[in-house]
Amino acid sequence: MADKDQGPATEWQSAQAAAIGHGAVAAINGGFFTPEGKPLGLVIEEGKRIGTWNSQSSLTSGLLSVEKSPRLLRRQHWRSFSPTRHLLQAGPFLIENSAVVRDLSDRERRPRSFLVWNGRHRWAFGIAEGVTLASLSAALAAQPLSEITITTALNLDGGRSSDLWASPRIPGGPVSTRRIWNTPVRNYLLLLPSR
């Protein structure tokens, strides 16, 4: 997790800049933020709380929580007293228990950023162009990744915020999805190399 204390227009202007600035091999835009540049929900970076807990919006219905190991869970299952190193509220869920999430919007085709997990130790993040939440959920439920069986998928901020970068150290890299029309974002999820 890399959050910009001073808001979206400061520090790293792209996923690539955020990744390089933190020694990461890949990065993707993170959670939603308000027009004033504040996180829409709670963000925790290295134990520091940023923003406030949001229990209302579907855009914060799930979270990535990193305690001893990372996991995706619904906001009602996280406890504020947990020793959380990193946390990002985002949403909605696209896949839960290896199944499509019902009642997702089938309107607004746009770029979507997402995070997937196999429920154990395998993770991936990606961007899909011109899809609805419902169509992305269906596509992910079809298990398109040969190296990971997706049990859980979480929608991240998308649209003009969608920005993924992978270095040449990643198989298939380098990759950058940044477009001229991208807007600065509040935070990024980072993939750090194994130590």
Which residues does each predicted region cover?
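Gly/Ser/Thr/Pro-rich low-complexity, intrinsically disordered segments
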Residues: 1-195
